[in-house]
Amino acid sequence: MDLKSLVRDIPDFPKPGILFRDITTLLRDPEGLRYTIDFLTQKCKEAEIKPDYVIGIESRGFIFGSPLAYQLGAGFIPIRKRGKLPAAVHSIEYDLEYGTDCLEVHQDALRHSSRVLIVDDLIATGGTASATAKLVQKIGCELVGFGFIIELRDLEGRKYLPDVPIISLIEY
C-alpha cells in the first residue's frame, strides 16, 4: 500500500512557507490505518524490538502507540506536556526554536530497567523525540527503538537520537 498517497499536503500551514503533512486523511481510511499499524508492527519485529512499554508522545503518538503496544504485547504509556497528568511526575525541559517546553510522565508509570519503544507520528528536527529519550533514560529505562510514521529527512532529526533502531514508514 502506498501510505504516502494517504497523507494530505497543506501548503502554508501553520505559517507561510511550511508544507504541513496532514495524517488525518490516513487516519480516516480504515485500510490505511490498519496497514500502518500492521506495517509498523512488522518493522518492529524485523528489528527485534521487544519493548515492555510503548511510549506515545502527545498527542498523535497516542494514536499509533496504543495499537502498536497491543500488537507487540506491551503496555502503553503517554508522555504529556506540562500540567496534563494528575499524579506525581518525572519531567524534562527542552529547547524549542523560540523558547522551551516540558514533557512529563507519571512517576509510577515506568520501572527501572524497563525496555521502551518511543512512538510519534512524525520526526522533523528530533527535539521532542530526543527529549523523550532523555526522560526515559533519566528514569533508568532501556531505550530499544523509535517508531515514526513520517520522517522529514531534510531536517536530519535522527542524528540527534540515540543509537538504537529507528523506524519510519514514510520519508519526505
Swiss-Prot record:
Homodimer. GO terms for molecular function: adenine binding; adenine phosphoribosyltransferase activity; AMP binding. Keywords: Cytoplasm, Glycosyltransferase, Purine salvage, Transferase. Its EC number is 2.4.2.7. Catalyzes a salvage reaction resulting in the formation of AMP, that is energically less costly than de novo synthesis. It comes from Nostoc punctiforme (strain ATCC 29133 / PCC 73102). Belongs to the purine/pyrimidine phosphoribosyltransferase family. The gene is apt. It catalyses: AMP + diphosphate = 5-phospho-alpha-D-ribose 1-diphosphate + adenine. InterPro entries: Ade_phspho_trans, PRibTrfase_dom, PRTase-like, UPRTase/APRTase. It is an enzyme of class 2 (transferase). PANTHER family: ADENINE PHOSPHORIBOSYLTRANSFERASE (PTHR32315:SF3). GO terms for cellular component: cytoplasm. NCBIfam families: apt (TIGR01090), PRK02304.1-3 (NF002634), PRK02304.1-5 (NF002636). It is found in: Cytoplasm. This is Adenine phosphoribosyltransferase. One of its GO terms (biological process) is adenine salvage. Pathway: Purine metabolism; AMP biosynthesis via salvage pathway; AMP from adenine: step 1/1. Pfam families: Pribosyltran (PF00156). Disulfide bonds: none annotated. SUPFAM superfamilies: PRTase-like (SSF53271). CDD domains: PRTases_typeI.
